[in-house]
Amino acid sequence: MQRINREESFRAKEERLKDLFVRGLSGNNAAYQTFLGELSSYLRAFLRKRLIRLPDEVEDLVQEALLAVHNQRHTYDPSQPLSAWVQAIARYKLVDLFRRRAIYEQRNDTLDDGMDLFSSADAEAAEARRDLNKLLADLPDHFRLPIMHTKLEGLSVREAADVSGMSESAIKVGVHRGLKALAAKIRGAL
């Protein structure tokens, strides 16, 4: 029921706009002015749905579409629905907007922004590495070596034991106690 009413309402609007437009094409200026006023409301709603994230562009695009309708009015075929013709023009204007924005964003996207991102990440990593090395340097070898081999170099407990000449148990205990000592040192520094 509601769908039928909506379709009837749409058809009535279509017929009204078409009548105003055809009368305007015949030289009736008042009908043409009314047509442009009503069409602008229709276009505004049509474009607002499609430009949810760019609401500031809606009014400009409405004006561009109205101008295009006016300039291309001689191409309208009265045997065809007016709404399809107007929507095609509005869609072309919408595509033009997206192209303009893409070109603008492409031209104005600086390469330096990407470099700053990586350089700051590198600088932060270097600072963290320096701070960690400073903290580890204060630990005795039986704590420092197990942490460096297992946590920083990614060796297994067995591999760390082989490299350092310590037992596997000593590696596990050294890591545990070394991390505990580092945590206490960091807490004391704060």
Swiss-Prot record:
Any GO BP: DNA-templated transcription initiation
DNA-binding region per Swiss-Prot/TrEMBL record: 157-176
Keywords tagged on the record: Cytoplasm, DNA-binding, Sigma factor, Stress response, Transcription, Transcription regulation
Motif Polymerase core binding per UniProt: ranges: 60-73
Region (Sigma-70 factor domain-4): 130-182
Cellular localization per UniProt: Cytoplasm
One family name in Pfam for this protein: Sigma70_r4_2
GO molecular function, one term: DNA binding
Any one of the GO CC terms: cytoplasm
Disruption phenotype: Growth inhibited by 100 uM chlorite during aerobic log-phase growth, no expression of the SigF regulon (Dsui_0156 to Dsui_0159). Growth of a double sigF-yedY2 mutant is completely inhibited by 20 mM chlorite.
Free-text function comment from the UniProt entry: Sigma factors are initiation factors that promote the attachment of RNA polymerase to specific initiation sites and are then released. Extracytoplasmic function (ECF) sigma factors are held in an inactive form by a cognate anti-sigma factor (NrsF in this case) until they are released. Regulates expression of only a few genes (Dsui_0154 to Dsui_0159) in response to (hypo)chlorite, conferring resistance to reactive chlorine species (RCS) during oxic growth.
Family: Belongs to the sigma-70 factor family. ECF subfamily.
Subunit structure: Interacts transiently with the RNA polymerase catalytic core formed by RpoA, RpoB, RpoC and RpoZ (2 alpha, 1 beta, 1 beta' and 1 omega subunit) to form the RNA polymerase holoenzyme that can initiate transcription.
UniProt protein name: ECF RNA polymerase sigma factor SigF
Taxonomic lineage: Bacteria, Pseudomonadati, Pseudomonadota, Betaproteobacteria, Rhodocyclales
Name of the gene this protein is made from: sigF
